[in-house]
Amino acid sequence: MGRKEDNIEKALKIVEHTELIRNIGIVAHIDHGKTTLSDNLIAGAGMMSEELAGKQLVLDYDEQEQARGITINAAVASMVHTFQGKEYLINLIDTPGHVDFGGDVTRAMRAVDGVIVVVDSVEGVMPQTETVIRQALREHVKPVLFINKIDRLINELRLNSDEMQKRFTKIITDVNRLISKYAPQQFTKEWQVSVQDGRVAFGSAYNNWAISIPAMAETKITFKDIVEYVKNGKQKELAQKNQLHKIILNMVIRHLPDPKTAQSYRIKQIWKGDLDSEIGKAMINCDYKGPVAMMVTKIIIDPHAGEIAIGRLFSGTVKKGTDLYISGAGKGKVQTLAMMVGPDRIPVDEITAGNIAAIVGLKGAIAGATVSSLENMVPFEPMIHYSEPVVTLAIEAKHTADLPRLIEVLRDISKADPSIQVDINQETGEHLISGMGELHLDVTLYRIKNDYKVEVETSDPIVVYRETVEKKGGPFEGKSPNKHNRFYFEVEPLKPEVIQAIEDGDIPQGSKFKDKKALVELLVSKGIDRDEAKGLVCVEGTNMMFDVTRGIQYLDETMELLIEAFVEVMNRGPLANEKVFGVKARLVDAKLHEDSIHRGPAQVIPAGRNSIYGAMCEAKRVLLEPVQRVFINVPQEEMGAAINEIQQRRGIIEDMKQEGDEISLTAKVPVAGMFGFASAIRGATGGKVLWSFENAGYQKVPPELQDSIVRSIRERKGLRQEPYDADYYASM
């Protein structure tokens, strides 16, 4: 253990010097070599033995991660590296590449200022590479590039040095295209990666070597020499001359920003408070003397210590015993403070601005929470998750006595991983857990059984559907039970560009808008009429409610209740009680009783609800199902088997490319058709297949299947078989 503590000892001398700190992440498509690279960097910095690097997978410390050979949690390691005679502290966060764990990537990006993008030289830039680059750039995180598995180009594809360089050029061009597309405007040119200035490195993480143009100038090794070393089995020798960790960490220190530099442009992206306030200035300057401002990016549930909140400290100094306020959860006292190295927490007395801290004592904090020494700090912007849960399981305790424990465990799990949603089905009393895919739920169930020791039984996986409308419906009259109040709503589909702006986080959720003027301008730019935009009342999920009435008496007093009715309908659609997607509801008229006693919640909420439901019935209700884009690489002779497997699952082939004997297929497949796909595609192609996928939003269920799917959902939820029609809502 000694070397780790020594390292933390060195680190503690550096923590107050922000110019010597780098907070970095490593991102990549699944299996492109992220964790292997992380372990090499940790070994090189003396945190574990060099022989084990790449084989030990320090950051894959979860039993499941080692068994599955993929990274599931975003782990943290702090290490020290000497560059040009100075010691630097590097806080490294390893993130998962598997699409099911995208939530962890989003959270890790908030904690870091720079990122190493790893690309497999054989596969090139893949869909998940694009997703993680987009996530990093959205958080104003600066990239550098490491092209990995060069030995495969030489040994498997038999490329010479010229052919290799052609391939590198293509990868670099692809990455720069994505940077141009997604980088903040002021950085689209400045953040382009180039070989010449050393922002790109090449190598083999597994074999511990790397090379970059600045390193070539020092060692006089050329690409031709590299081909010879690899061909002749001399990669160990190559690794001694060009140590991976030195080349990569030198690149990080040279080209990725320190916390103070990064916070000068990142704070206004991630925090919408007053930048001229005391805390605003302290964060922009990364000032350790200012008030404490920290964002929790991960909660680890430790069997001994309980909840550990890990997060990025943007200003101030945290010490043992400090009282801190947690957004939405009251006050907590710092009991212990530590720096993290994979699974180990090394205790420290204090941590200053610009660092990553692990704190015990912030009870009630969740990933995404704002922690501050000020009671009323404006919270950080919520983190945008690129994918919503698409698969649900019903879960129950095997032994009734374990039920209270199961409820506690589910609460812990949803704290530690906010991309897992836990709901209780009010009708049946069963617990539902929803995640990003089959693997995500498998891993969660494994944790419940093995880490928390609760025996559970689960249903088959259930797909998460959405409801929408196809055309305009209403105005539809909704009457209150006492018949003294009437509301008239219209509904229609929301424009795709408005839905996109909501999903990107440009349009905030809820009904309290900080800068209504700017929001109106944004809506007008997306094609919404100005008068209508001014009447925006509420955003719920990807749906919006507008009030376009004029001068109706007492309406202001009932608006909160109408918002409640709207939110309820958007979370329980009229077809199958599934969430509603992409619908605009407009209140166009209302008739209200003058006596407030006759327009309380029990009158207004049902009237508003029936008006929106009725208008949706008139607007042709449609069921949407989640779809995934699937990417498959197979030898030519297995192409037929792969296409057949896709088509059996209602999939559509969108694209097909050939490179040598390899065929690359891109297909769109409903999530409902993807269960068991992994073993089926391996079986069909005799194991000769590489495949991956990403969530690709929702599409309409084929009309011939809609009725039967709606019926089966309603049956599962204990509802009457047929959905109610417009006449029913009119008669209420």
Swiss-Prot record:
GO terms for molecular function: GTP binding; GTPase activity; translation elongation factor activity. GTP binds at residues 28-35, 94-98, 148-151. Residues 19-228 form the tr-type G domain. CDD domains: aeEF2_snRNP_like_IV, EF2, EF2_II, EF2_snRNP_III, Elongation_Factor_C. GO terms for cellular component: cytosol; ribonucleoprotein complex. The modification Diphthamide is found at residue 598. Keywords: Cytoplasm, Elongation factor, GTP-binding, Nucleotide-binding, Protein biosynthesis. It holds the Pfam family EFG_IV. It comes from the Archaea. It is found in: Cytoplasm. Catalyzes the GTP-dependent ribosomal translocation step during translation elongation. During this step, the ribosome changes from the pre-translocational (PRE) to the post-translocational (POST) state as the newly formed A-site-bound peptidyl-tRNA and P-site-bound deacylated tRNA move to the P and E sites, respectively. Catalyzes the coordinated movement of the two tRNA molecules, the mRNA and conformational changes in the ribosome. Belongs to the TRAFAC class translation factor GTPase superfamily. Classic translation factor GTPase family. EF-G/EF-2 subfamily. PANTHER family: ELONGATION FACTOR-LIKE GTPASE 1 (PTHR42908:SF3), TRANSLATION ELONGATION FACTOR-RELATED (PTHR42908). This is Elongation factor 2.
